């Protein structure tokens, strides 16, 4: 007698582990669901590892489709602004940040059009990682062509690479500057209200508010409701 047993082929299982190396980030990684851009942060546990004890927090929806590809066609140059993949270490230890040039005008840089994604009267938080390049003053804006002043945040880069808020050119409900690791990166962001959505809306990165074509390093743009 012959006994036949069905063999079930199992799909390969991929696994990896993460361990914190120095004070590089307040969380281990971000997970994004491609179908709707929902994101969550996975935190390190008490042993600076990712484990079953790690918490997942701040699940949100990033309204920016290409938040980490600043040279994607979704992002356009303004007044000669450009975004070039850089070779420096990004906030998570890779080489995925961009050197953004401001071009010839104070508002030069890059922008991503998000028309139709905002609701008038609602609050939104726009943030990204920035690191000092050659510029001494940079600005990020939640822009609407029919609204002035737009929700925005301007920082002055000190000679040691530490940014400080320029309150004279900031219009926001709240602002935040958070030091990330020890390599010059800061998470910079603000919360503002979409006062008008009848025009064209976009998020901007304006590296050089002095209009001299200087640069800032940028990574991981995020727009949350």
Annotated model-derived regions:
Residues 1-225:
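Extracellular and organelle-lumenal recognition/adhesion modules and their flexible linkers in secreted
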């Amino acid at each position: 007698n012959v006994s036949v047993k069905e063999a079930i082929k199992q799909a390969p299982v991929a696994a990896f582990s993460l361990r914190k190396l120095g004070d590089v980030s307040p969380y281990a990684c971000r997970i994004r669901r491609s179908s709707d851009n929902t994101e969550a942060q996975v935190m390190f546990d008490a042993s600076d590892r990712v484990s079953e004890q790690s918490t997942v927090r701040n699940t949100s929806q990033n309204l920016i489709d290409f938040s980490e590809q600043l040279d994607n066609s979704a992002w356009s140059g303004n007044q000669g602004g450009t975004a070039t993949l850089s070779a420096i270490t990004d906030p998570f230890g890779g080489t995925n940040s961009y050197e953004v040039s401001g071009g010839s005008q104070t508002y030069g840089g890059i922008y991503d059009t998000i028309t139709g994604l905002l609701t008038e009267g609602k609050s939104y938080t726009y943030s990204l990682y920035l690191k000092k390049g050659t510029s001494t003053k940079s600005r990020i804006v939640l822009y609407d062509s029919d609204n002035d002043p737009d929700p925005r945040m301007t920082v002055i880069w000190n000679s040691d690479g530490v940014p400080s808020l320029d309150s004279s050119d900031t219009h926001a409900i709240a602002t935040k500057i958070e030091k990330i690791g020890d390599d010059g990166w800061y998470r910079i962001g603000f919360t503002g209200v979409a006062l008008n959505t009848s025009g064209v809306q976009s998020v901007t990165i304006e590296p050089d508010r002095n209009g001299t074509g200087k640069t800032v390093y940028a990574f991981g743009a995020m727009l949350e409701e």
